[in-house]
Amino acid sequence: MNDALLIEGALVLDLDGDADRPARADILIRDGEIAAVGPGLGDPAHPARAGLPPPARVLDGRRRLAIPGLVNAHYHSHDVLLKGMFDPLPLEQWNLLALPPSYPRRPREELRLRTLLGAAECLRGGITTVADMNRVQPFDEGDLDVVLAAYEEAGIRVVYAPHFSEVPPTVTTPFLTDCVPESELWRLSGAPPMFARGEDGLARIEAAITARTGRHPLITFALGPSAPERVRAETLPRIADVSARLGIPVFTHLCESRAAVVHARHAMPGGSIVELMAQAGLLNERLTLAHNVWLTEAEIARLAEAGANLVLNMVGNLKTRSGVAPVKAMRRTGAHLALGADNCSCSDAQNLFQVMKAFCTLPAVSDDPDEAPPPAVDALRAATEGGARAVGLAGRVGAIRPGMRADLVLLDLGDPS
């Protein structure tokens, strides 16, 4: 079967070249992979076409800018239907209203439809890969399969991380346990635990991932502990072990709000969640941390040295009144940066162009005013190559190069929007 596609005459964005003046080139795609990039690929005598039949399809790219598909490196599909539901709220209050523990178990047709709706919005905005920390509560493999089947139906690339916790977020709200017994806090958060009492939740998740790995070329997996402080301390080294054995990333939330840092100062080794993760063996290139708003410079440097990935959710953090991540300090340390649009109920849109703009503009009015904010090319890199690294797909997506998967976006240069 000849499924070759030739895109002729597009301006092709190369972040390692002249990103301000992209060169005009053709892109030859075979079997979903970029076979060649360069001028003259429409000529059957071109060396890159040797031994190949004529492309089955040819697209005119002359009024298009070809960019790598964007990577939404932090996303939750479980609240797609809550878009626009809330005015700005503090994170700890929003946690009690917007997340699956706060509402009854959803029917499977709703799971399918909300997954499709979220995927469609992402695709329409140029996002071709999502890192979905999706919470199925209570954890049910039949529900999980419904979500994965919806992603297959949508045709978007997904790194799926079952989102789980072992303690409610109320337990990690500073000093709340001094007022309310811990046994009652699950009621305050709206639901019983994800897993039955005494059940090994991580073992169930590992088994579910192992059984489904390799079933579909667009679906890979990660582990999704809600936050280091929202699982038991003895579970953290086990998460590191499962990640190493399966060779998959760990997605989690870090220092999203002031309250999280206050809790860490009182309850964590050395007063730091980063130190807690280090002692558990989690600090490595497979660790992907969302938010990172209230990290210290020393913590940022430690994460950068370990090769961890920092995903910034610049828009969602405004609506949850969490603050602005210290982007300039992160860039100074050489930290690996990626971007995400986070929950639909706190960002209201899966739009990485909004996030890229905020990544460049918010640091312009925060931190040291004499230090320049990141340029646009750095935002694009974080949304493509940085995102690919963060979700475990480095070298496969995130750039327009031979050998990479052909996850591309063609932007219409004649469209004034």
Residues of each region from the PLM?
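Divalent metal-coordination and catalytic microenvironments
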Residues: 10, 27, 32, 63, ...
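His/Asp/Glu-enriched, well-ordered alpha-helical/loop segment
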Residues: 279-286, 328-415
